[in-house]
Amino acid sequence: MTDQSHQCVIIGIAGASASGKSLIASTLYRELREQVGDEHIGVIPEDSYYKDQSHLSMEERVKTNYDHPNAMDHSLLFQHLQALKRGSAIELPVYSYVEHTRMQETVRVEPKKVIILEGILLLTDARLREEMNFSIFVDTPLDICLMRRIKRDVNERGRSMDSVMAQYQKTVRPMFLQFIEPSKQYADIIVPRGGKNRIAIDILKAKISQFFE
């Protein structure tokens, strides 16, 4: 864990796929932004750092285990976090869930006082944990996560229900048990019931607000 005197404060939010991480991150961002302004807080999704697969065929891309740490370019994410802490802007990769690879364009992200980082595998990497000022694990039952994942992937990512279920059984659940669940031990705060836990969100807001004082 890093010293809180750093210019850029990194807050990590991890948990299972469809556990409510993104909802918590977006709620914190939206409500804190109203207090401090866009220039002081930002969100970076770990999904942006899925490795480039443009050299692979679509058939090969869909076979990738996206719930394994090896699917992530954590080295690039680590470098970007260090750059933000030095006060340098980064070029955030853009990942397409439809094409299963990075796009050519990037999004410029300027340094902020607080960066909220959210993703399933954040706490599995010791380098990333060291860059976080504190970390959160969203602890939601897997059956609820599965229902949310089916709804999200079918409606928002152009997936079929059969493909979502097959991926869940083959990689999502096994990788959660092997990598994500054990990483909960590294979290400073564990949030049950996902993004609808208003009390937890208010506590997190109060904690994060201290960094703006």
Curated annotation (Swiss-Prot):
GO terms for cellular component: cytoplasm. Its main location: cytoplasm. The keyword Cytoplasm applies. Pfam families: PRK (PF00485). Pathway: Pyrimidine metabolism; CTP biosynthesis via salvage pathway; CTP from cytidine: step 1/3; Pyrimidine metabolism; UMP biosynthesis via salvage pathway; UMP from uridine: step 1/1. InterPro entries: P-loop_NTPase, PRK/URK, Uridine_kinase, Uridine_kinase-like. GO terms for molecular function: ATP binding; cytidine kinase activity; uridine kinase activity. It is found in: Cytoplasm. The keyword RNA-binding does not apply. It is an enzyme of class 2 (transferase). It catalyses: uridine + ATP = UMP + ADP + H(+); cytidine + ATP = CMP + ADP + H(+). GO terms for biological process: CTP salvage; UMP salvage. ATP binds at G15, A16, S17, A18, S19, G20, K21, S22. Its EC number is 2.7.1.48. Belongs to the uridine kinase family. This is Uridine kinase. It comes from Salmonella typhimurium (strain LT2 / SGSC1412 / ATCC 700720). The lineage of its organism: Bacteria, Pseudomonadati, Pseudomonadota, Gammaproteobacteria, Enterobacterales. The gene is udk.
